[in-house]
Amino acid sequence: MPKMKTRKAVASKFRVTATGKLKASRPGRRHKLTGKTPKRKRQLRRPGLVDDGHLKTYKRLMCL
């Protein structure tokens, strides 16, 4: 059986934490920032964790 290939699009968007969870930047901070409050933009800076429903799928795509 051949080796599985990593999906580079997924691998570039997520980082693996020490506990095996996936960390990603939050959506909504690319454009149209004038309509968002400073508090909202500040909260979007922090990376978010992937929820458990998608975790298994993304890990499989990253060959983890």
From Swiss-Prot:
Molecular function GO labels: structural constituent of ribosome
Keyword Ribonucleoprotein set for record: yes
GO cellular component: cytosolic large ribosomal subunit
UniProt GO BP: translation
Pfam families documented for this protein: Ribosomal_L35p (PF01632)
Highest taxon of the lineage: Bacteria
Keyword annotations of the record: Ribonucleoprotein, Ribosomal protein
Residue ranges, annotated region (Disordered): 19-44
Keyword Ribosomal protein attributed: yes
InterPro entries in UniProt: Ribosomal_bL35, Ribosomal_bL35-like, Ribosomal_bL35_sf
Compositionally biased residues, Basic residues: 23-44
HAMAP family associated with the record: Ribosomal_bL35 (MF_00514)
UniProt record similarity statement: Belongs to the bacterial ribosomal protein bL35 family.
Protein name per its UniProtKB record: Large ribosomal subunit protein bL35
